[in-house]
Amino acid sequence: MSLIKWSIDPTHSEIAFKVKHLMISTVTGQFKKFSLVGETETDDFNTARKIEFTADIDSIDTNNEQRDAHLKSADFFNGERHPQITFSGTKYEDKEDGKLYGDLTIAGVTRPVTLNVEFGGIATDPYGQTKAGFTVAGKISRKEFGITYGAVTETGGVLLGDEIKINAEIQLVKQVVEEKAAA
């Protein structure tokens, strides 16, 4: 039996999120520094044994430095105490509608989440590297992770929505194939 190790290709991947602002428009942000490692027994990912993802809070970018600084503060992600968001996959199902189950930790709070996954396939690039592509999407409640900042407008409206939409375009690079002795 072999064990295949995969890591993220950061130049061909992006991790983005969206949240309602004033309930009339959407603010989009992304994380510029992130990593993902995975282990599978085959190239089809149905045998995924490990999926570990991290995003650095300090790399958040919403195209507004003042807002980014506020998001890093204790009002939101508390980046000083919790410098990373982590996701640890527990199960992957590549059926008609792919699902990735795992534990997401934001600001020190861990919750189980289910993400929708579209497997784009496997290809070899011009440099001989084997790559796998995925689109990952999901929704979470920021309040379930203890992010409850909620300024109110002068008319009593909500400044920020609770629902956060996650969208990631992931390209993984096959790193190592290790032969494991049968147990």
Go through each PLM region and give its residues.
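Low-complexity, acidic/polar, glycine-enriched regions of mature
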Residues: M1-A183
